């Protein structure tokens, strides 16, 4: 888990080297547990692997949001995450490819991430930590596993 600015700077170098359109992002927030929600965890994946970024532990997230505004990303159900990005850092990705929107346009009746992953890959995703309090630290092993999957 990336929880220090120096680690974030190293991550940014690696992320900047990835081909456009080959980056996946997801966010976890604490909207079910706090009145003014905030981004509690950033899940990042590319062709070389995945990692978790802890924005609650890193005071200066500018390496992330500066990278974000020049990046094409894949997300699922990106509308809420875009609101969080805009509210937290007043920025958005350069381009967003939303798999939920694509599934709806293609006529899928079940367009949730779990349904699509099962349909295309035969893998059942756990929803065990979907409603967890992502602002609590340390994250439990179950939450970390959920976030990386």
Per-region residue spans from a language model:
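A polyampholytic, Gly/Pro-enriched intrinsically disordered region
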Residues: 113-126
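Residue-level signal for alpha-helical context at structural boundaries
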Residues: 103, 120, 134-135
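Conserved RNase H-like, two-metal-ion catalytic cores of nucleic-acid enzymes
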Residues: 1-115
């Amino acid at each position: 888990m990336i929880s220090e600015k120096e680690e974030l700077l190293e991550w940014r170098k690696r992320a900047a080297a990835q081909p456009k359109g080959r980056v996946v992002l997801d966010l976890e927030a604490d909207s079910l547990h706090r009145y003014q929600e905030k981004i509690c965890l950033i899940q990042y994946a590319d062709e070389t692997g995945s990692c978790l970024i802890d924005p609650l532990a890193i005071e200066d997230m500018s390496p992330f949001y500066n990278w974000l505004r020049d990046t094409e990303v894949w997300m699922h159900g990106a509308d809420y995450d875009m609101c969080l990005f805009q509210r937290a850092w007043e920025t958005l990705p350069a381009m967003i490819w939303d798999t939920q929107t694509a599934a709806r346009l293609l006529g899928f009746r079940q367009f949730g991430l779990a349904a699509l992953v099962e349909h295309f890959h035969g893998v059942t995703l756990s929803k065990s930590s979907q409603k967890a309090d992502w602002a609590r630290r340390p994250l439990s092993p179950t939450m970390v596993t959920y976030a990386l999957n």
